[in-house]
UniProtKB/Swiss-Prot annotation:
UniProt protein name: Large ribosomal subunit protein uL14
Family the UniProt entry places it in: Belongs to the universal ribosomal protein uL14 family.
CDD domains linked to this entry: Ribosomal_uL14
Keyword Oxidoreductase in record: no
Gene that encodes the chain: rplN
Free-text function comment from the UniProt entry: Binds to 23S rRNA. Forms part of two intersubunit bridges in the 70S ribosome.
Xref: PANTHER family: 50S/60S RIBOSOMAL PROTEIN L14/L23 (PTHR11761), LARGE RIBOSOMAL SUBUNIT PROTEIN UL14M (PTHR11761:SF3)
Lineage: Bacteria, Pseudomonadati, Thermodesulfobacteriota, Desulfuromonadia, Desulfuromonadales
Organism from which the protein derives: Pelobacter propionicus (strain DSM 2379 / NBRC 103807 / OttBd1)
Pfam family, one: Ribosomal_L14
Superkingdom of this protein's organism: Bacteria
Oligomeric and partner information: Part of the 50S ribosomal subunit. Forms a cluster with proteins L3 and L19. In the 70S ribosome, L14 and L19 interact and together make contacts with the 16S rRNA in bridges B5 and B8.
An example Gene Ontology molecular-function term: structural constituent of ribosome
């Protein structure tokens, strides 16, 4: 569960290290974002000579949340951190690698490129 002003880790090699959530997309009064939702974020930390710079405003898709996520079969999944992947306006990842596991719910939200790059889908 991500809301405005949440700090997230970045799970790709776009060069950003920390993101600061500015807005949750999808409705004028939407408060929270879960796995597979898109947010607008500011880059708080970045590596030198990277594709994104500190202070850039980017879009990101949430791939892991520390708040547990209920599945239709009654099971729950929860991760150790809140992480996102920086995406462009065509909903494709800016980086070429994804680090760590991602949730299966991304498949239903049509983020197939992220699913294929991820080392593990839980």
């Amino acid at each position: 569960m991500i809301q405005m002003q949440t700090i997230l880790d970045v799970a790709d090699n776009s060069g950003a290290k920390k993101l600061f959530c500015i807005k949750v997309l999808g409705g004028s009064k939407r408060k929270y974002a879960g796995v597979g939702d898109i947010i607008v974020a500011s880059v708080r930390e970045a590596l030198p000579n990277s594709k994104v710079k500190k202070g850039d405003v980017v879009k990101a898709v949430i791939v892991r949340t520390a708040k547990e996520l209920g599945r239709p079969d009654g099971s729950y999944i929860r991760f150790d951190d809140n992480s996102g992947v920086v995406i462009n306006n065509q909903k494709e990842p800016v980086g070429t690698r994804i680090f760590g596991p991602v949730a299966r719910e991304l498949r239903a939200k049509k983020f197939m490129k992220i699913i294929s790059l991820a080392p593990e889908v839980l």
